């Protein structure tokens, strides 16, 4: 199988580290502040030009379902 010139030759694998100034950590319980309800645990993070701090949240009600949200949309719960 041939590779195109824009393919990644060495995929990234293994552990990654949250930024040192992250608002939430892996496993923290959070919920959306408004709009459609979503509550669960932090399972990852992301950043883009428009969202410098965002999180992946796995639903407690529907295990395996994950949504991504900017930090401003989430609040910590106990």
Swiss-Prot record:
Catalysed reaction equations from the record: (6S)-5,6,7,8-tetrahydrofolate + NADP(+) = 7,8-dihydrofolate + NADPH + H(+)
Binding-site residues for substrate, renumbered to this chain: 68
Record flagged with keyword NADP: yes
Binding-site residues, NADP(+): 32-36, 66-69
BP term (GO), one: one-carbon metabolic process
InterPro entries: Dhfr_type_II (IPR009159), Elect_transpt_acc-like_dom_sf (IPR008990), MscS_beta-dom_sf (IPR023408)
Keywords noted in UniProt: Antibiotic resistance, Methotrexate resistance, NADP, One-carbon metabolism, Oxidoreductase, Plasmid, Trimethoprim resistance
Pathway: Cofactor biosynthesis; tetrahydrofolate biosynthesis; 5,6,7,8-tetrahydrofolate from 7,8-dihydrofolate: step 1/1
Protein origin, superkingdom: Bacteria
E.C. numbers: 1.5.1.3
GO MF term set: dihydrofolate reductase activity
The keyword Oxidoreductase belongs to this UniProt entry's keyword annotation: yes
Function noted in UniProt: Key enzyme in folate metabolism. Catalyzes an essential reaction for de novo glycine and purine synthesis, and for DNA precursor synthesis.
Note, other: Type II plasmid-specified enzyme is practically insensitive to trimethoprim and methotrexate.
Note on domains (UniProt): The active site is situated at the inner surface of a pore formed by the four subunits.
Quaternary structure and partners: Homotetramer.
Name of this protein: Dihydrofolate reductase type 2
High-level lineage: Bacteria, Pseudomonadati, Pseudomonadota, Gammaproteobacteria, Enterobacterales
